[in-house]
Amino acid sequence: MEKEKLIEEINRLKEERNAIIMAHNYQLPEIQDIADFLGDSLELARKAVNIDADVIVFAGVDFMAETAKILNPEKTVLLPTPRATCAMANMLTIKHIIEAKKKYPDAPVVLYVNSSAEAKAYADVTVTSANAAKIVGKLDSDVVIFGPDKNLAHYVAKVTGKKVIPVPPNGHCYVHRKFTLEDVERARKLYPNAKLMVHPECEPEVQEQADIIVSTGGMIKRACEHDEWVVFTEREMVCRLQKLYPSKKFYPAREDATCIGMKAITLNHIYESLRDMKYRVEVPAEIAEKARKAIERMLEMS
């Protein structure tokens, strides 16, 4: 089916099913273009609270679709393909959390939303890269257990001055781990007038070279501050920024900074998922109830 016809059919099915499409900033441009809501993890979580639709098609990775389902237990949530997974979320196990709690029984468990629903059920609060430092700073504890991203944990510790225990010790995003000091040096040489916007999932040594350290939502908000930027996150963010700020220049720090899970979703997947109402996201009620408390606490605190 041709692209124009595919989009036409998706829109027809959306109306027929009373569906909306939520998409993350890392999605392919053609999916960003058809999304009803587009944003980072925090923005999408906020949007998911009061959705006026019967069906949510989530163009993101699995943990994001799970979060939408947890916040909307009565609605149908579709993940267009089961291949849209997050490797980092799968690095954190329940065993990691239980072992950390044995060592630090009084420390609250703070989990990045990039985690499974089962893990979130053990959390005191969830966070996103946009609000992690703010929320940890508000907690009445000088020690927190934080997972699964060790680099975001480093950033939070630096901003808050608190002791942040990463679980697992080497949890990371393989896309952001690609960025190195060599990329920083190359960016400075190629684009001497540009500033560097760096995602806090990047390695600490790369964060230290940043002009600003921000989530993808923060990148959108702060891009107005300068005319040229080198973007240290998933490459599709450059497309999003360029559309929002056509008069400014944005350069990907690496052309190969690609999230396989995010790119697993195509227009055809969205069409087939809506047509057949397949790949429904389900979260067991007991897990969802516990995880919902941690997510709702995040939304209240941010």
Curated annotation (Swiss-Prot):
Binding site for iminosuccinate: 24, 41, 112-114, 129, 199-201, 216
Organism: Thermococcus kodakarensis (strain ATCC BAA-918 / JCM 12380 / KOD1) (Pyrococcus kodakaraensis (strain KOD1))
Pathway(s): Cofactor biosynthesis; NAD(+) biosynthesis; quinolinate from iminoaspartate: step 1/1
Protein name: Quinolinate synthase
GO cellular component: cytoplasm
Catalysed transformations (reactions): iminosuccinate + dihydroxyacetone phosphate = quinolinate + phosphate + 2 H2O + H(+)
Cofactor binding description: Binds 1 [4Fe-4S] cluster per subunit.
Entry annotated with the keyword Transferase: yes
Keywords: 4Fe-4S, Cytoplasm, Iron, Iron-sulfur, Metal-binding, Pyridine nucleotide biosynthesis, Transferase
Record-stated family: Belongs to the quinolinate synthase family. Type 2 subfamily.
Enzyme Commission code: 2.5.1.72
EC class (word): transferase
Principal subcellular localization: cytoplasm
InterPro entries the record matches: NadA, NadA_sf, Quinolinate_synth_type2
Gene name in the database record: nadA
BP terms from Gene Ontology: 'de novo' NAD biosynthetic process from L-aspartate
